[in-house]
Amino acid sequence: MAILNEEWQQLLADYRAYHDNPLCEATHVIGIPMIMASLPAMIVPPVGLSLFTAGWALQFVGHWFQGNPPKFFGDRRNLAVGALWWVDTALRPTGLNTRLFGRPVPPSPTA
């Protein structure tokens, strides 16, 4: 059973379509976990800030390769969708992503 409702499945599909450049995807595969790890690491500010800054730098480099601005500029929910995208991408080889997030839906025409 999917844990995402239709709206969030659509957000994930749109996010996936928006990040279709392999270099952008690679920077996100590395940068998103760095940003996520930086939050609890803020207990040691130099470590947390370094992870946070490097992670976001990778995000922006990826979007430079992609040729578009970060998706969250238009909708802040995409900050959370980025983390879901990372989990979806990491689990894709196992097939568990379909069980968690449902069958992939096509991106919306405005994605």
Which residue ranges define each predicted feature?
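Transmembrane helix interruption/hinge and helix-loop junction motifs
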Residues: A41-L49
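Membrane interfacial helix-start motif at the N-side
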Residues: Q9-L39
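Hydrophobic alpha-helical transmembrane segments
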Residues: A26, G48-T53
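Structural signal for membrane-spanning alpha-helices in multi-pass inner-membrane proteins
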Residues: L39-M42, Q59, H63, T89
